[in-house]
UniProtKB/Swiss-Prot annotation:
PROSITE patterns: SHSP (PS01031). Pfam families: HSP20. Keywords: Cytoplasm, Stress response. It is found in: Cytoplasm. One of its GO terms (biological process) is protein stabilization. This is 18.1 kDa class I heat shock protein. Forms oligomeric structures. GO terms for cellular component: cytoplasm; protein-containing complex. Its main location: cytoplasm. GO terms for molecular function: identical protein binding. Belongs to the small heat shock protein (HSP20) family. Transmembrane segments: none annotated. The gene is HSP18.1. Residues 44-158 form the sHSP domain.
Length: 158
């Protein structure tokens, strides 16, 4: 396990091994079959396909935050399934090309993403709220109130 963080979104990134840094991959444009679950997603930018989501638990709720720069709220779906699963998905289309345009570089991400989270028993599934501001999706799942055990003092006789 490397103690160095990966900045390449799941790709090999051992800074001490020059062959592990995917700087130039001569085979990346060949259409090899891929049996991975993400094979149905476009391969333009793995950073978008593997959208990162933060999940924190506060005393009142479970809060999920996803950075989705450039997406409109209409391009994102937040769903809750009966078996306590929160699903966040969306898609950004590739920009349409004009025959007169000459592209020098294409680095902006495009493609589909899908993230699923199994929620704990204390989640109020019927009270989930979502908002999107400045490209950050925030999903708030309130928690059931935990009833405090009622403590009754017993007088000791004798």
């Amino acid at each position: 396990m490397s103690l160095i963080p990966s900045f390449f979104s799941g790709r090999r990134s051992n800074v001490f091994d020059p062959f592990s840094l995917d700087v130039w991959d001569p085979l990346k444009d060949f259409p090899f079959s891929n049996s991975s679950p993400s094979a149905s997603f476009p391969r333009e930018n793995p950073a978008f396909v593997s959208t990162r989501v933060d999940w924190k638990e506060t005393p009142e709720a479970h809060v999920f935050k996803a950075d989705l720069p450039g997406l409109k709220k209409e391009e994102v779906k937040v769903e809750v399934e009966d078996d306590r699963v929160l699903q966040i998905s969306g898609e950004r289309s590739v920009e349409k090309e004009d025959k007169n345009d000459e592209w020098h570089r294409v680095e902006r991400s495009s493609g589909k993403f899908l993230r699923r989270f199994r929620l704990p028993e204390n989640a109020k599934m019927d009270k989930v709220k979502a908002s999107m501001e400045n490209g950050v999706l925030t999903v708030t799942v309130p928690k059931e109130e935990i009833k405090k055990a009622e403590v009754k003092s017993i007088e000791i006789s004798g």
